[in-house]
Amino acid sequence: MKLKIREGTISDDELCGAIMLGALVSADIPRSFLKDDVLILPLRSNLRFIAFYDQTPAGFCDYSVSKSHINYLFVDPLFQASGVGTFLLENVQRRLETPISVNVLCRNEKAILWYLKKDFTFTKLWSEQFNGQLTAWLKLTKKTF
């Protein structure tokens, strides 16, 4: 196994959307916001890392330096539990060097447990409209290493 990482660009929007879609399907997260089962994830003003497992795109992380916040961290289901998510998280932590936050859907128990295992702590719970329904979210925060 050889994990590599590179900076992502807007040319990776479709790739990241495909990885995110695969992970959402795997976690049985509603995807009513999709049109024709296609997701293009715009980079906007975020920074992005793309992880490769033996030269195959395996995951990505979009994050904000100014907010010290992970906007998205998704791993292709074929590569979950192989260290890709940890690899992405560690690279973001080294880049930010400040406490990091992430918002996770409460129904995504697998992701919540993963972040808690990585020493994130519960910061906030709230509900807001998402996909046309009231949805519960958790904010998790981690001090840097």
Residue map of PLM features:
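Acetyl-CoA-dependent GNAT
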Residues: 7-78, 89-91, 95
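Conserved N-terminal entry element of GNAT/NAT acetyltransferase domains
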Residues: 1-11, 140-145
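Short glycine/proline-centered loop/turn elements that form peptide/ligand docking sites
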Residues: 85, 89, 107-111, 128-134
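Conserved acetyl-CoA-binding loop of GNAT-fold acetyltransferases
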Residues: 116-125
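Conserved GNAT acetyl-CoA-binding A-motif
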Residues: 95-107
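Conserved acetyl-CoA-binding loop-helix of GNAT-fold acetyltransferases
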Residues: 81-94, 113, 117
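Active-site acidic-Proline motif in GNAT/NAT acetyltransferases
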Residues: 76-82, 106-107
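Short hydrophobic/aromatic beta-strand or adjacent loop that forms the aromatic wall/cage
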Residues: 46, 133-139
